[in-house]
């Protein structure tokens, strides 16, 4: 357990045995990376809101963040979620190497600008990102795209898919259809002659919903069945499971009313690092590498979540083939890039002529290496083996009181005359509000000539605000501007914002 970011910029020092250079695996939900063909299943990604300039911003931001790894070289393996399932696919899969050769003398800015044509419009999102990364010196990737297939019982078509970028030779690929979720992408690579299985997941959304948990149970069964097949053939097979599981690492503990959870009960994710040496548990969840106060890749209603996950099998702790580097797991939060003023993921926004932001999830990462010993009877010596400690059942609260409101807030005098806050330019901004409370049960405030709802995801705080804010009175607070069901609102996440 250590500074979560240091592994990205400091070369790994002492390692357990003579081995090949450590390599990095990153898991990253990019929050809807769509291409530039002007066709999309989501309304927000139609040309009216998602122009070529937006595509370019999205690509450049993803590439910029990935360039923070390995001294600008980028990770050797990336498990991506939320790439657009190409709405205009060709008869054959695109040849990404050929695409890079074709556009070797053209930068991505030109491809989406003055040199944009039908051929560029026809390129899928993964090819565009590959080019944006190549322009920054991140090269040598093989690209594997999950098939847009689902299992029987799926209720609707899906617009996203999972994608893997890897520098290692690819030996086998399978897409496993599952109910109401993106196909689970299995990629078998070879690292210094050793086989390594990668499983890229994006399970059904709605982490706290018991109805959708039943679907995630089915997603877990799909993955568990294939994992069990591999481990029956070789109990010490090297397998990395990654992705957006739309479940927390301690999902069972956080949702005690759920009789069966997909990630813990069916898949078998758990936090006892030594247990995988035995025969009863074959998966270890890397979130347990971090102290409780550092666990969080995303946030919902003021609580940190751990939807982005990486799990490893027992084989990654032995001395054959690929080996996990102890305590190397972390969360990629880069100040000034993908972290907002509240310390949360700086999510994508359509605001302005070119959009901005990164994703509503922080990426997670871990280091691995290969060992030549070929011994499955010897285990990595752990500095401090993790256990499933008594973690609080509720999610860890976001520390909104720590936000420097004076520094980040938009003030009334900064808003140009005759300009409405009700626009993408101000959506998501923290605003210093001084206004008049409106009448009625719904708490509202009149500010700069317009009426806004005042809301908090903390129910107790909402009630206190209703008692404290009386109709006709002047109130002062900081609120995050947003929109819910076509109503504009200021969200007050913490009582310390009322001042």
Show the residue positions of the predicted features:
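Metal-dependent phosphoester-hydrolase catalytic domains
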Residues: 175, 179, 229-237, 247-414, ...
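N-terminal, active-site-proximal structural segment of metallo-dependent hydrolase catalytic domains
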Residues: 18-159, 342, 351, 369-401, ...
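Catalytic metal-binding/acid-base residues of hydrolase active sites
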Residues: 31, 83-84, 202-204, 245-248, ...
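OB-fold single-stranded nucleic acid-binding module
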Residues: 273, 385-499
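A long, amphipathic alpha-helix that forms part
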Residues: 212-235
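Conserved beta strand-loop-helix elements of the APE1-like EEP
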Residues: 128-136, 153-172, 302-321, 367-369
């Amino acid at each position: 357990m250590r500074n979560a970011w240091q592994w990205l910029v400091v070369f790994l020092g002492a390692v357990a045995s003579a081995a090949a250079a450590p390599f990095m695996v990153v898991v990253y939900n990019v929050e809807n990376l769509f291409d530039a063909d002007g066709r999309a299943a989501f309304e927000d990604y139609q040309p009216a809101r998602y122009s070529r300039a937006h595509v370019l911003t999205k690509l450049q931001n993803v590439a910029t963040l990935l360039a923070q790894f390995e001294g600008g070289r980028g990770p050797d393996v990336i498990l991506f979620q939320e790439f657009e399932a190409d709405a205009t696919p060709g008869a054959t899969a695109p040849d990404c190497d050929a695409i890079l050769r074709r556009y070797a003398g053209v930068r991505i800015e030109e491809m989406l600008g003055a040199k944009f044509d039908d051929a560029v419009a026809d390129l899928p999102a993964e090819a565009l990102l590959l080019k944006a990364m190549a322009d920054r010196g991140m090269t040598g990737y093989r690209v594997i795209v999950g098939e847009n297939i689902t299992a029987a019982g799926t209720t609707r078509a899906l617009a996203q898919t999972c994608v893997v970028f890897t520098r290692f030779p690819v030996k086998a690929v399978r897409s496993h259809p599952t109910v109401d979720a993106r196909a689970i992408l299995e990629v078998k690579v070879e690292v210094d002659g050793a086989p390594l299985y990668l499983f890229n997941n994006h399970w059904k959304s709605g982490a706290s919903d018991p109805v959708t948990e039943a679907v995630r149970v089915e997603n877990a069964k799909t993955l568990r069945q294939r994992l069990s097949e591999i481990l029956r053939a070789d109990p010490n097979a090297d397998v990395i499971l990654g992705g957006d599981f739309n479940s927390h690492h301690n999902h069972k503990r956080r949702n005690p009313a759920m009789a069966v959870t997909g990630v813990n009960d069916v898949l078998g994710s758990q936090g006892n690092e030594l247990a995988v040496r035995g025969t009863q548990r074959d998966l270890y969840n890397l979130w347990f590498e971090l102290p409780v106060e550092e666990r969080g890749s995303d946030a919902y209603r003021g609580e940190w979540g751990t939807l982005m996950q990486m799990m490893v099998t027992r084989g990654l702790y032995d001395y054959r083939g690929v080996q996990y580097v102890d305590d190397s797991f972390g969360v990629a939060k880069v100040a000034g890039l993908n972290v907002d003023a509240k310390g949360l993921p700086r999510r994508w926004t359509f605001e302005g002529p070119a959009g901005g932001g990164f994703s509503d999830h922080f990426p997670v990462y871990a280091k691995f290496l290969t060992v030549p010993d070929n011994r499955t009877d010897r285990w990595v010596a752990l500095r401090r083996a993790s256990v499933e400690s008594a973690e609080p059942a509720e999610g860890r609260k976001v520390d909104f009181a720590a936000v420097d409101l004076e520094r980040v807030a938009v003030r009334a005098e900064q808003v140009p005359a005759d300009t409405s806050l009700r626009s993408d330019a101000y959506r998501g901004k923290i605003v210093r509000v001084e206004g008049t409370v409106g009448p009625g049960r719904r708490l509202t405030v009149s500010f700069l000539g317009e009426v806004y709802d005042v809301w908090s995801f903390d129910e107790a705080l909402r009630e206190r605000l209703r008692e404290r804010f009386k109709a006709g009175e002047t109130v002062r607070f900081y609120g995050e501007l947003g929109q819910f069901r076509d109503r504009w609102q200021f969200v007050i996440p913490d009582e310390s914002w009322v001042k």
